[in-house]
Design a protein with these regions (language model features):
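Glycine- and charge-rich intrinsically disordered segments
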Residues: 1, 159
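Solvent-exposed edge beta-strands and adjacent loop segments
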Residues: 2-73, 117-144
Length: 159
């Protein structure tokens, strides 16, 4: 019989972070991050398919998006860093996973990737950067990265 314990089984969204570059540097002041994986389908319908469409799996692609507060802090990846990555057009390493446990104060937390837990990684190119500054609001920014190659789980091929 399955044992379910939501206090142990579920991953709190605050602990799932996006890290970029080979140094696994966290995106500073991130408020949201997501990984979207999509597979194309190839139409294989023929007269042998009767009245139903037939498909087989095609290429797989993915995007990573992240929203964060705009900051001048240089300890994490900032909007300025992301803009420079986009202009360079070079691929960057990315990692999405839980941060390591930290017993110090919130202000001194280095937000390092916990490689003992499940994480996803790969290479991607920054394809979109936007900066938003509303009245009586903290300025925020959004980025999108488009995958270059495979998504890996814990540094290994999936499947």
């Amino acid at each position: 019989m399955a044992n379910w314990n939501e206090n142990q089984d579920l991953i709190h969204g605050d602990n799932l972070l996006l890290y970029l570059t080979s140094g696994k540097t966290v995106v500073a002041y991130a408020t949201n991050c997501s990984l979207q994986i999509d597979a194309e389908s190839i139409d294989t319908s023929s007269k042998f398919s009767c009245r139903f469409n037939s498909n087989m799996g095609g290429k797989i692609g993915y995007t990573i998006s992240c929203d964060s507060l705009y900051t001048a802090n240089e300890d994490g990846i900032s909007f300025d860093d992301l803009m420079a990555m986009m202009v360079s057009g070079e691929q960057t390493e990315w990692y999405m996973g839980q941060e390591s446990a930290w017993t110090g104060t919130c202000e001194t937390n280095p937000h390092t990737l916990d490689t003992t837990k499940t994480y996803f990684n790969g290479k991607a190119v920054v394809t979109s950067c936007s900066l938003e500054a509303g009245n009586n609001d903290i300025a925020s920014c959004s980025i999108t990265l488009t995958g270059a190659g495979e998504v890996q789980k814990n540094g290994s091929t999936i499947g």
